Amino acid sequence: MFDVLIYLFETYMHNEPEMLVDQDKITDDLADAGFYREDINNALNWLEVLADLQEGQKAPYLYTADPQALRIYTVEECRRLGAACRGFILFLEQIQVLQFDTREMVIDRIMALDSPEIDLEDLKWVVLMVLFNIPGYENAYKQMEELLFEVNDGYLH
């Protein structure tokens, strides 16, 4: 499913954000590209939930949390997000790429993936997808895009 999400993001969302797309056409295009229908449907559902989160239609508790609260990860979240990923999320909060609400969106979308464990590169892509359509997060998106595509110049995080 994650490969489908990356393909969709690079092909449709990132390159043509204003374009209205027909979900049936996208499904057919993805199937023609060699993706399995189940992965395609899971990816499209994942994106629908993300859109609902971004519009505040789901999980309104995300917007009522105290921004100074400390995030304690559940056992399942710790299994899925290793120490490097959790540290990177904290780093993104410290440099204000993520706020408490967008952090929770990222964690929600990570937990909805069908992967038992997420690596740092996958996490960066999910953060980029979450930030992509949120008004007011354009600078955070640009910063995250730079972090995703940066070549290792000795940058520590």
Curated annotation (Swiss-Prot):
HAMAP family: Smg (MF_00598). NCBIfam families: PRK03430.1. This is Protein Smg. Belongs to the Smg family. It comes from the Bacteria.
